Amino acid sequence: MMALQSKNIEYKRRKNHSKGESFLTKHRIGFSILIFILGFVLILSILSYTPKDQANLVSISEIGKILTGDEQVREKLERTHNWLGFVGAKVSYFLINYTFGYSSILLGFILIFWGLFLFFNKDRGKLVKWTFYLLFFSFLSSLFLGNLKLIFGTEEFKSEICGIVGLYVADVMIKLFGGLGSMFITLVSFLIFLGFIVEVNFYDVAISIGE
């Protein structure tokens, strides 16, 4: 009796799993195109980002006034410089200021790659690997620029260039290791990361240097 129940449970589990797979397979093309478009839109919004749009951003409470034709809201929307209007200005402002700065544009390329891989049904193992590479490169770039911002602290060097992630992590590292130490660790991390990408054998390199 117990064996029969376990077989029924296993059968239902496989049936539900196959339904999920068939749904994804059936709509794979649609999902891939949607993801590709989202990535392309994200890239365009970041490319056309300007701090000037910050003063023209419509708050959540004002979104409803767009439909009622509020004059002040309409003027804000007309002064928006982003190529994708209010939505592009809002998305780019969040990504640039609250993630990796201008390096967050790589998030758009990640979405495009996901869309292409799904569309052509390619091996997703490589896709996951390169997604990690691009995310880590975005983080390291943000960290490097955050170090430059905090060490040199010029007014021309805006915080948007590194984002809050790079600025925060760089601040912690500078407090722990000093400016020179933080920059050294960041640059070494870059070299090790690039070595992994091109598959450098660091042991062989060390041996050849020793010889």
Task: List each language-model region with its residue ranges.
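Alpha-helical transmembrane segments used as membrane anchors
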Residues: 1-211
